[in-house]
Amino acid sequence: MQTAPPSRSGSAARPAPASPRETVEHLEAALAKCSATEAGAGENPWRSLFYEHLRDEGLPALVKNDAVTPAGSLWTGARLWTKSFREFSLQAGDRIVLALPPSTAFVQVLVAALWEGLTIALVPPNDNIGGACAALDARGAVALKPGPFRWTADPYAGPASVPDVLRPTEGSRTPDVRFLVRTSGTTQRARWIALSDRNVLSVLASHLPHLTLQRARVLSVLPWSHVFGLVLDLLPALLAGAEIIRDPAGGRDPASLTALGEAWKATHLSAVPRTIQRLLATERGPALLRRLHGGIVGGAPVAGPLADRLAETHLRAGYGQTEAAPGIALGAPGEWAAHYMGRPLGCQVAVGANGELSFEGPNACVGVWRRHEGLDRRSPNRTVRTGDLVRREGADLFFEGRTDTAFKLSNGRFVRAGAWEGRLKRQFPSLHDVLLFAPAGDDVSVALCTDPSGPNSPSETAIREVLGPLAERLVGCVRIAPTDWVRRGKGTVDREEMTRRLRASQSAN
Protein backbone atom coordinates (compact mmCIF):
# COMPACT_ATOMS: atom_id res chain seq x y z
CA MET A 1 0.00 0.00 0.00
CA GLN A 2 3.06 2.28 0.06
CA THR A 3 5.67 3.62 -2.30
CA ALA A 4 9.26 4.70 -1.87
CA PRO A 5 9.68 8.27 -0.66
CA PRO A 6 9.53 10.90 -3.41
CA SER A 7 12.77 12.68 -4.14
CA ARG A 8 13.41 15.07 -1.27
CA SER A 9 15.30 17.42 -3.57
CA GLY A 10 12.18 18.07 -5.57
CA SER A 11 14.12 17.46 -8.80
CA ALA A 12 12.65 14.06 -9.61
CA ALA A 13 9.57 13.85 -11.77
CA ARG A 14 6.48 14.11 -9.61
CA PRO A 15 2.94 13.35 -10.76
CA ALA A 16 1.16 16.56 -11.62
CA PRO A 17 -1.84 17.27 -9.40
CA ALA A 18 -4.85 19.18 -10.62
CA SER A 19 -4.18 22.85 -11.27
CA PRO A 20 -5.34 25.33 -8.61
CA ARG A 21 -8.06 26.55 -10.98
CA GLU A 22 -9.31 23.01 -11.58
CA THR A 23 -9.35 22.28 -7.86
CA VAL A 24 -11.34 25.43 -7.11
CA GLU A 25 -13.76 24.60 -9.94
CA HIS A 26 -14.24 21.12 -8.45
CA LEU A 27 -14.89 22.66 -5.02
CA GLU A 28 -17.38 25.16 -6.40
CA ALA A 29 -19.18 22.36 -8.25
CA ALA A 30 -19.35 20.35 -5.03
CA LEU A 31 -20.58 23.39 -3.10
CA ALA A 32 -23.31 23.95 -5.69
CA LYS A 33 -24.77 20.57 -4.70
CA CYS A 34 -25.35 21.84 -1.14
CA SER A 35 -28.51 23.75 -0.31
CA ALA A 36 -28.63 26.51 2.28
CA THR A 37 -31.10 24.53 4.37
CA GLU A 38 -29.39 21.15 3.83
CA ALA A 39 -32.87 19.61 4.11
CA GLY A 40 -33.44 16.47 2.11
CA ALA A 41 -29.78 15.98 1.27
CA GLY A 42 -29.34 15.15 -2.40
CA GLU A 43 -26.20 14.19 -4.29
CA ASN A 44 -23.16 13.61 -2.08
CA PRO A 45 -20.72 16.47 -2.89
CA TRP A 46 -17.63 14.62 -1.64
CA ARG A 47 -17.76 11.69 -4.03
CA SER A 48 -16.81 13.59 -7.16
CA LEU A 49 -14.06 15.44 -5.27
CA PHE A 50 -12.37 12.30 -4.01
CA TYR A 51 -12.90 10.42 -7.27
CA GLU A 52 -11.12 13.21 -9.16
CA HIS A 53 -8.33 13.81 -6.66
CA LEU A 54 -7.47 10.39 -5.16
CA ARG A 55 -8.36 7.51 -7.49
CA ASP A 56 -5.35 6.24 -9.49
CA GLU A 57 -3.27 9.27 -8.48
CA GLY A 58 0.24 9.55 -7.06
CA LEU A 59 -0.45 12.80 -5.26
CA PRO A 60 -1.55 13.77 -2.70
CA ALA A 61 0.68 11.58 -0.57
CA LEU A 62 0.92 11.19 3.18
CA VAL A 63 4.34 10.81 4.78
CA LYS A 64 4.73 9.72 8.40
CA ASN A 65 7.78 8.11 9.98
CA ASP A 66 9.30 7.98 6.46
CA ALA A 67 6.49 5.72 5.20
CA VAL A 68 4.81 7.20 2.14
CA THR A 69 1.21 6.46 1.16
CA PRO A 70 0.21 7.85 -2.28
CA ALA A 71 -3.28 8.92 -3.23
CA GLY A 72 -4.09 5.65 -4.97
CA SER A 73 -3.37 3.70 -1.78
CA LEU A 74 -5.39 6.17 0.29
CA TRP A 75 -8.25 5.49 -2.13
CA THR A 76 -7.86 1.69 -1.97
CA GLY A 77 -7.85 1.69 1.83
CA ALA A 78 -10.88 3.97 1.89
CA ARG A 79 -12.78 1.51 -0.32
CA LEU A 80 -12.11 -1.24 2.25
CA TRP A 81 -13.61 0.97 4.94
CA THR A 82 -16.59 1.76 2.72
CA LYS A 83 -17.17 -1.97 2.26
CA SER A 84 -17.11 -2.54 6.02
CA PHE A 85 -19.48 0.36 6.75
CA ARG A 86 -21.93 -1.05 4.21
CA GLU A 87 -21.67 -4.55 5.69
CA PHE A 88 -22.89 -3.06 8.97
CA SER A 89 -25.73 -1.27 7.12
CA LEU A 90 -24.61 2.20 8.16
CA GLN A 91 -26.66 4.85 6.40
CA ALA A 92 -26.26 8.55 5.68
CA GLY A 93 -26.53 10.50 8.90
CA ASP A 94 -25.53 7.65 11.20
CA ARG A 95 -23.03 9.05 13.69
CA ILE A 96 -19.61 7.46 14.16
CA VAL A 97 -16.69 8.56 16.30
CA LEU A 98 -13.32 8.85 14.55
CA ALA A 99 -10.65 8.61 17.25
CA LEU A 100 -7.41 7.86 15.41
CA PRO A 101 -4.19 9.87 15.44
CA PRO A 102 -3.21 11.69 12.24
CA SER A 103 -2.20 8.85 9.94
CA THR A 104 -2.93 7.00 6.72
CA ALA A 105 -5.72 5.13 8.50
CA PHE A 106 -7.29 8.40 9.67
CA VAL A 107 -7.45 9.70 6.09
CA GLN A 108 -8.85 6.42 4.75
CA VAL A 109 -11.62 6.32 7.37
CA LEU A 110 -12.38 10.02 6.80
CA VAL A 111 -12.72 9.56 3.04
CA ALA A 112 -14.92 6.49 3.44
CA ALA A 113 -17.19 8.15 5.99
CA LEU A 114 -17.58 11.23 3.79
CA TRP A 115 -18.27 9.00 0.78
CA GLU A 116 -21.09 7.30 2.71
CA GLY A 117 -22.53 10.55 4.07
CA LEU A 118 -22.01 9.57 7.71
CA THR A 119 -21.90 12.14 10.50
CA ILE A 120 -18.30 12.11 11.72
CA ALA A 121 -17.49 13.05 15.31
CA LEU A 122 -13.79 13.87 15.61
CA VAL A 123 -12.24 12.86 18.94
CA PRO A 124 -8.58 12.80 20.07
CA PRO A 125 -7.35 9.19 20.24
CA ASN A 126 -6.77 9.20 23.99
CA ASP A 127 -10.22 10.52 24.90
CA ASN A 128 -12.94 8.48 26.57
CA ILE A 129 -14.28 6.77 23.45
CA GLY A 130 -17.23 5.11 25.15
CA GLY A 131 -18.21 8.37 26.76
CA ALA A 132 -18.06 10.16 23.42
CA CYS A 133 -20.25 7.51 21.78
CA ALA A 134 -22.82 7.86 24.55
CA ALA A 135 -22.77 11.66 24.52
CA LEU A 136 -23.21 11.79 20.75
CA ASP A 137 -25.62 8.85 20.42
CA ALA A 138 -23.17 7.30 17.95
CA ARG A 139 -23.47 3.87 16.33
CA GLY A 140 -19.81 3.08 16.87
CA ALA A 141 -16.22 4.28 16.76
CA VAL A 142 -12.97 3.73 14.92
CA ALA A 143 -10.28 3.72 17.59
CA LEU A 144 -6.77 2.52 18.41
CA LYS A 145 -7.85 -0.25 20.80
CA PRO A 146 -10.68 -2.79 20.57
CA GLY A 147 -13.78 -2.25 22.66
CA PRO A 148 -17.57 -2.31 22.49
CA PHE A 149 -19.02 -1.05 19.18
CA ARG A 150 -15.52 -0.37 17.78
CA TRP A 151 -13.51 -0.91 14.66
CA THR A 152 -9.74 -0.86 14.85
CA ALA A 153 -7.62 0.12 11.89
CA ASP A 154 -4.83 -1.55 9.99
CA PRO A 155 -2.17 1.13 9.44
CA TYR A 156 -2.67 1.03 5.66
CA ALA A 157 -5.30 -1.51 4.60
CA GLY A 158 -8.75 -0.97 6.06
CA PRO A 159 -10.19 -2.46 9.25
CA ALA A 160 -8.01 -4.65 11.47
CA SER A 161 -11.03 -5.71 13.53
CA VAL A 162 -14.74 -4.99 13.43
CA PRO A 163 -17.37 -4.69 16.17
CA ASP A 164 -19.62 -7.59 17.08
CA VAL A 165 -22.62 -5.27 16.90
CA LEU A 166 -23.26 -1.56 16.60
CA ARG A 167 -24.53 0.59 19.42
CA PRO A 168 -28.33 1.08 19.46
CA THR A 169 -29.25 4.74 19.21
CA GLU A 170 -32.06 6.72 20.78
CA GLY A 171 -32.33 9.67 18.40
CA SER A 172 -32.75 10.11 14.68
CA ARG A 173 -30.03 10.24 12.05
CA THR A 174 -28.44 13.57 11.12
CA PRO A 175 -27.80 13.40 7.35
CA ASP A 176 -27.47 17.19 7.12
CA VAL A 177 -24.59 17.20 9.63
CA ARG A 178 -21.24 16.10 8.29
CA PHE A 179 -19.01 16.78 11.26
CA LEU A 180 -19.43 17.09 15.00
CA VAL A 181 -16.37 18.97 16.22
CA ARG A 182 -15.64 19.98 19.77
CA THR A 183 -14.62 23.56 20.53
CA SER A 184 -11.27 24.02 22.24
CA GLY A 185 -12.83 25.18 25.49
CA THR A 186 -10.17 27.87 25.96
CA THR A 187 -12.70 30.71 26.20
CA GLN A 188 -15.79 28.85 27.42
CA ARG A 189 -16.98 25.35 28.19
CA ALA A 190 -16.32 23.01 25.27
CA ARG A 191 -19.32 22.33 23.02
CA TRP A 192 -20.02 19.97 20.12
CA ILE A 193 -20.54 22.08 17.00
CA ALA A 194 -22.47 20.65 14.04
CA LEU A 195 -20.99 21.48 10.63
CA SER A 196 -22.65 20.72 7.30
CA ASP A 197 -21.16 19.94 3.91
CA ARG A 198 -21.95 23.52 2.91
CA ASN A 199 -20.11 24.93 5.93
CA VAL A 200 -16.89 23.06 5.24
CA LEU A 201 -16.92 23.28 1.44
CA SER A 202 -17.60 27.03 1.50
CA VAL A 203 -14.49 27.61 3.62
CA LEU A 204 -12.40 25.35 1.39
CA ALA A 205 -13.65 27.18 -1.71
CA SER A 206 -12.93 30.63 -0.26
CA HIS A 207 -9.56 29.86 1.33
CA LEU A 208 -7.85 27.32 -0.93
CA PRO A 209 -7.19 29.79 -3.80
CA HIS A 210 -5.03 31.84 -1.40
CA LEU A 211 -2.94 28.99 0.01
CA THR A 212 -0.55 28.38 -2.96
CA LEU A 213 -0.54 24.62 -2.39
CA GLN A 214 0.24 23.34 -5.88
CA ARG A 215 3.28 21.02 -5.67
CA ALA A 216 3.48 21.87 -1.97
CA ARG A 217 5.11 19.87 0.78
CA VAL A 218 2.99 20.58 3.82
CA LEU A 219 4.60 20.10 7.22
CA SER A 220 1.55 19.08 9.25
CA VAL A 221 1.47 19.58 13.03
CA LEU A 222 -2.11 20.57 13.84
CA PRO A 223 -4.46 17.95 15.34
CA TRP A 224 -6.87 16.72 12.68
CA SER A 225 -9.52 16.24 15.36
CA HIS A 226 -9.79 20.05 15.59
CA VAL A 227 -11.46 22.09 12.89
CA PHE A 228 -8.36 24.23 12.15
CA GLY A 229 -6.30 21.13 11.41
CA LEU A 230 -9.07 19.38 9.50
CA VAL A 231 -10.42 22.16 7.27
CA LEU A 232 -7.41 24.44 6.78
CA ASP A 233 -4.55 21.92 6.95
CA LEU A 234 -5.52 18.38 5.94
CA LEU A 235 -8.39 18.81 3.46
CA PRO A 236 -6.79 21.62 1.38
CA ALA A 237 -3.56 19.63 1.12
CA LEU A 238 -5.43 16.49 0.02
CA LEU A 239 -7.46 18.30 -2.63
CA ALA A 240 -4.49 20.32 -3.90
CA GLY A 241 -2.36 17.22 -4.43
CA ALA A 242 0.26 18.12 -1.84
CA GLU A 243 2.74 15.90 -0.05
CA ILE A 244 1.65 15.92 3.59
CA ILE A 245 4.64 15.45 5.89
CA ARG A 246 3.14 14.56 9.27
CA ASP A 247 5.16 15.36 12.39
CA PRO A 248 4.67 12.44 14.82
CA ALA A 249 5.14 14.82 17.77
CA GLY A 250 2.50 17.27 16.54
CA GLY A 251 4.87 20.25 16.77
CA ARG A 252 5.76 19.71 20.43
CA ASP A 253 9.44 18.94 19.72
CA PRO A 254 10.79 21.94 17.77
CA ALA A 255 14.19 20.38 17.09
CA SER A 256 12.75 17.25 15.47
CA LEU A 257 10.17 19.36 13.64
CA THR A 258 12.93 21.51 12.18
CA ALA A 259 14.88 18.43 11.11
CA LEU A 260 11.78 16.94 9.49
CA GLY A 261 11.06 20.15 7.60
CA GLU A 262 14.65 20.36 6.39
CA ALA A 263 14.81 16.71 5.33
CA TRP A 264 11.66 16.95 3.22
CA LYS A 265 12.22 20.53 2.06
CA ALA A 266 8.83 21.56 3.42
CA THR A 267 7.15 24.49 1.70
CA HIS A 268 4.14 25.10 3.98
CA LEU A 269 3.33 24.99 7.68
CA SER A 270 0.15 25.97 9.52
CA ALA A 271 0.33 26.19 13.29
CA VAL A 272 -0.74 27.93 16.46
CA PRO A 273 1.48 30.77 17.74
CA ARG A 274 3.03 28.61 20.45
CA THR A 275 4.49 26.21 17.87
CA ILE A 276 6.02 29.15 16.00
CA GLN A 277 7.51 30.50 19.24
CA ARG A 278 9.09 27.12 19.95
CA LEU A 279 10.64 27.03 16.47
CA LEU A 280 12.00 30.56 16.83
CA ALA A 281 13.71 29.54 20.06
CA THR A 282 15.81 26.88 18.28
CA GLU A 283 19.00 27.40 16.31
CA ARG A 284 17.65 26.34 12.90
CA GLY A 285 13.94 27.04 13.35
CA PRO A 286 14.01 30.68 12.18
CA ALA A 287 15.69 29.71 8.90
CA LEU A 288 13.08 27.01 8.31
CA LEU A 289 10.27 29.52 8.82
CA ARG A 290 11.86 31.99 6.42
CA ARG A 291 12.16 29.31 3.71
CA LEU A 292 8.49 28.38 3.80
CA HIS A 293 6.31 29.48 0.89
CA GLY A 294 3.15 29.77 2.96
CA GLY A 295 0.93 28.65 5.80
CA ILE A 296 -1.52 30.01 8.37
CA VAL A 297 -0.82 31.03 11.96
CA GLY A 298 -4.07 31.02 13.92
CA GLY A 299 -5.90 29.75 16.96
CA ALA A 300 -4.69 32.51 19.29
CA PRO A 301 -3.76 36.20 19.05
CA VAL A 302 -0.22 37.05 17.95
CA ALA A 303 1.50 39.63 20.15
CA GLY A 304 3.72 42.40 18.82
CA PRO A 305 7.14 40.75 19.34
CA LEU A 306 6.05 37.56 17.58
CA ALA A 307 4.35 39.56 14.81
CA ASP A 308 7.68 41.30 14.13
CA ARG A 309 9.35 37.92 13.60
CA LEU A 310 6.52 36.60 11.43
CA ALA A 311 6.81 39.65 9.17
CA GLU A 312 10.12 38.11 8.01
CA THR A 313 8.25 35.04 6.67
CA HIS A 314 5.57 34.19 4.09
CA LEU A 315 3.20 32.94 6.78
CA ARG A 316 -0.16 34.66 7.06
CA ALA A 317 -2.63 35.46 9.83
CA GLY A 318 -5.80 33.42 10.02
CA TYR A 319 -8.81 33.86 12.25
CA GLY A 320 -11.92 31.83 12.80
CA GLN A 321 -13.93 29.76 15.23
CA THR A 322 -15.22 26.22 15.25
CA GLU A 323 -18.68 27.72 14.72
CA ALA A 324 -17.38 29.17 11.42
CA ALA A 325 -15.87 25.93 10.10
CA PRO A 326 -13.43 27.78 10.98
CA GLY A 327 -12.82 30.48 8.35
CA ILE A 328 -13.65 34.12 9.03
CA ALA A 329 -10.54 36.14 8.11
CA LEU A 330 -7.19 35.67 6.39
CA GLY A 331 -4.18 37.93 6.00
CA ALA A 332 -1.66 38.26 3.20
CA PRO A 333 1.72 36.47 3.33
CA GLY A 334 4.13 38.29 5.63
CA GLU A 335 1.56 40.93 6.58
CA TRP A 336 1.74 41.21 10.36
CA ALA A 337 1.14 43.63 13.20
CA ALA A 338 0.34 43.14 16.86
CA HIS A 339 -2.89 41.12 17.25
CA TYR A 340 -3.61 41.18 13.51
CA MET A 341 -6.42 38.82 12.44
CA GLY A 342 -6.58 39.33 8.66
CA ARG A 343 -9.40 40.47 6.39
CA PRO A 344 -12.87 38.91 6.18
CA LEU A 345 -13.01 36.06 3.68
CA GLY A 346 -15.97 33.96 2.60
CA CYS A 347 -18.47 35.64 4.92
CA GLN A 348 -19.79 39.03 5.99
CA VAL A 349 -18.71 40.56 9.29
CA ALA A 350 -19.88 43.43 11.47
CA VAL A 351 -18.47 45.08 14.59
CA GLY A 352 -21.06 46.02 17.21
CA ALA A 353 -21.15 49.16 19.31
CA ASN A 354 -19.36 47.29 22.10
CA GLY A 355 -16.65 46.10 19.70
CA GLU A 356 -17.90 42.51 19.43
CA LEU A 357 -17.36 40.82 16.06
CA SER A 358 -20.22 38.95 14.43
CA PHE A 359 -20.42 37.11 11.11
CA GLU A 360 -22.94 35.56 8.77
CA GLY A 361 -22.59 33.44 5.67
CA PRO A 362 -22.38 29.85 4.41
CA ASN A 363 -19.74 29.04 7.05
CA ALA A 364 -22.16 29.53 9.99
CA CYS A 365 -22.61 26.18 11.75
CA VAL A 366 -25.96 24.43 11.53
CA GLY A 367 -26.33 23.68 15.21
CA VAL A 368 -24.97 22.46 18.52
CA TRP A 369 -25.20 18.88 19.76
CA ARG A 370 -26.43 18.55 23.35
CA ARG A 371 -26.18 15.34 25.33
CA HIS A 372 -29.56 13.70 26.02
CA GLU A 373 -31.19 16.31 23.77
CA GLY A 374 -29.59 15.79 20.37
CA LEU A 375 -29.10 18.43 17.71
CA ASP A 376 -30.12 21.98 18.56
CA ARG A 377 -30.52 23.29 15.02
CA ARG A 378 -29.71 26.88 14.11
CA SER A 379 -30.82 28.93 11.11
CA PRO A 380 -28.12 28.95 8.41
CA ASN A 381 -28.96 32.59 7.63
CA ARG A 382 -28.47 33.92 11.14
CA THR A 383 -25.89 36.35 12.49
CA VAL A 384 -23.37 34.66 14.81
CA ARG A 385 -21.76 36.59 17.64
CA THR A 386 -18.17 35.49 18.21
CA GLY A 387 -17.57 36.85 21.71
CA ASP A 388 -14.36 38.44 20.40
CA LEU A 389 -13.73 42.16 20.73
CA VAL A 390 -12.02 43.65 17.69
CA ARG A 391 -11.18 46.94 16.09
CA ARG A 392 -11.44 47.50 12.38
CA GLU A 393 -8.98 49.57 10.36
CA GLY A 394 -10.29 49.63 6.81
CA ALA A 395 -10.66 45.99 5.82
CA ASP A 396 -8.24 44.77 8.50
CA LEU A 397 -9.32 43.26 11.82
CA PHE A 398 -7.33 43.39 15.07
CA PHE A 399 -8.03 41.38 18.20
CA GLU A 400 -8.82 43.41 21.33
CA GLY A 401 -10.09 40.86 23.85
CA ARG A 402 -13.04 38.72 24.87
CA THR A 403 -16.50 39.73 26.03
CA ASP A 404 -16.55 36.93 28.60
CA THR A 405 -13.52 38.18 30.56
CA ALA A 406 -15.50 40.89 32.35
CA PHE A 407 -15.85 40.80 36.13
CA LYS A 408 -17.44 42.81 38.93
CA LEU A 409 -15.69 44.44 41.85
CA SER A 410 -17.14 44.11 45.33
CA ASN A 411 -18.62 47.61 45.03
CA GLY A 412 -20.62 46.48 41.99
CA ARG A 413 -18.43 48.20 39.40
CA PHE A 414 -18.33 46.24 36.13
CA VAL A 415 -14.84 45.88 34.64
CA ARG A 416 -14.69 44.93 30.96
CA ALA A 417 -11.25 43.38 31.27
CA GLY A 418 -10.97 42.30 27.63
CA ALA A 419 -11.62 45.80 26.31
CA TRP A 420 -9.11 47.39 28.70
CA GLU A 421 -6.49 44.76 27.92
CA GLY A 422 -7.00 45.46 24.23
CA ARG A 423 -6.39 49.16 24.75
CA LEU A 424 -3.17 48.49 26.65
CA LYS A 425 -1.86 46.07 24.03
CA ARG A 426 -2.72 48.52 21.26
CA GLN A 427 -0.96 51.38 23.07
CA PHE A 428 2.11 49.29 23.95
CA PRO A 429 2.68 46.79 21.10
CA SER A 430 5.95 45.51 22.61
CA LEU A 431 3.92 43.71 25.29
CA HIS A 432 3.41 39.99 24.80
CA ASP A 433 0.16 39.99 26.76
CA VAL A 434 -1.84 41.80 29.45
CA LEU A 435 -4.12 40.50 32.20
CA LEU A 436 -6.45 42.57 34.36
CA PHE A 437 -7.60 40.93 37.58
CA ALA A 438 -9.08 41.75 40.98
CA PRO A 439 -6.55 40.77 43.67
CA ALA A 440 -9.04 40.97 46.54
CA GLY A 441 -12.33 41.96 44.96
CA ASP A 442 -12.17 45.68 45.74
CA ASP A 443 -9.61 46.95 43.23
CA VAL A 444 -7.75 45.93 40.06
CA SER A 445 -4.18 45.00 39.23
CA VAL A 446 -2.48 44.70 35.86
CA ALA A 447 -0.06 41.93 34.90
CA LEU A 448 2.20 42.74 31.94
CA CYS A 449 3.93 39.97 30.00
CA THR A 450 7.11 41.65 28.83
CA ASP A 451 10.68 40.75 27.84
CA PRO A 452 13.08 41.46 30.72
CA SER A 453 15.83 42.35 28.22
CA GLY A 454 13.54 43.94 25.64
CA PRO A 455 12.36 47.53 25.19
CA ASN A 456 11.38 49.39 28.30
CA SER A 457 7.94 48.24 29.40
CA PRO A 458 5.38 50.95 30.12
CA SER A 459 5.53 52.65 33.49
CA GLU A 460 2.66 52.50 35.95
CA THR A 461 1.99 56.15 35.17
CA ALA A 462 1.61 55.32 31.47
CA ILE A 463 -0.68 52.42 32.36
CA ARG A 464 -2.86 54.73 34.45
CA GLU A 465 -3.16 57.18 31.57
CA VAL A 466 -4.56 54.46 29.31
CA LEU A 467 -6.94 53.14 31.97
CA GLY A 468 -8.50 56.57 32.45
CA PRO A 469 -11.32 56.44 35.02
CA LEU A 470 -10.45 52.84 35.95
CA ALA A 471 -7.02 54.03 37.13
CA GLU A 472 -8.50 55.12 40.46
CA ARG A 473 -9.02 51.42 41.27
CA LEU A 474 -5.50 50.35 40.17
CA VAL A 475 -3.46 49.05 43.12
CA GLY A 476 -0.67 47.16 41.38
CA CYS A 477 1.27 46.64 38.17
CA VAL A 478 3.37 43.47 37.97
CA ARG A 479 5.78 42.52 35.16
CA ILE A 480 6.18 38.87 34.21
CA ALA A 481 8.59 37.26 31.75
CA PRO A 482 7.07 35.25 28.87
CA THR A 483 8.59 32.05 30.30
CA ASP A 484 6.52 32.51 33.47
CA TRP A 485 3.29 33.49 31.70
CA VAL A 486 0.86 30.58 32.00
CA ARG A 487 -0.57 29.64 28.62
CA ARG A 488 -2.89 27.04 27.19
CA GLY A 489 -1.85 24.75 24.37
CA LYS A 490 -2.57 27.24 21.56
CA GLY A 491 -0.76 30.10 23.29
CA THR A 492 -3.69 31.97 24.88
CA VAL A 493 -3.32 32.95 28.51
CA ASP A 494 -4.75 30.58 31.10
CA ARG A 495 -6.68 33.31 32.88
CA GLU A 496 -7.87 31.18 35.77
CA GLU A 497 -4.46 29.75 36.66
CA MET A 498 -2.64 33.02 36.01
CA THR A 499 -5.04 34.94 38.25
CA ARG A 500 -4.71 32.31 40.98
CA ARG A 501 -0.92 32.58 40.95
CA LEU A 502 -0.96 36.37 40.92
CA ARG A 503 -3.36 36.51 43.85
CA ALA A 504 -1.29 33.99 45.80
CA SER A 505 1.90 35.96 45.11
CA GLN A 506 0.36 39.25 46.20
CA SER A 507 -1.10 37.63 49.31
CA ALA A 508 2.31 36.20 50.24
CA ASN A 509 3.88 39.62 49.85
Predicted region positions:
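AMP-binding/adenylate-forming catalytic core of the ANL superfamily
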Residues: 361, 387-473
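Conserved C-terminal "lid"/linker of ANL adenylate-forming enzymes
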Residues: 407, 435-438, 464-509
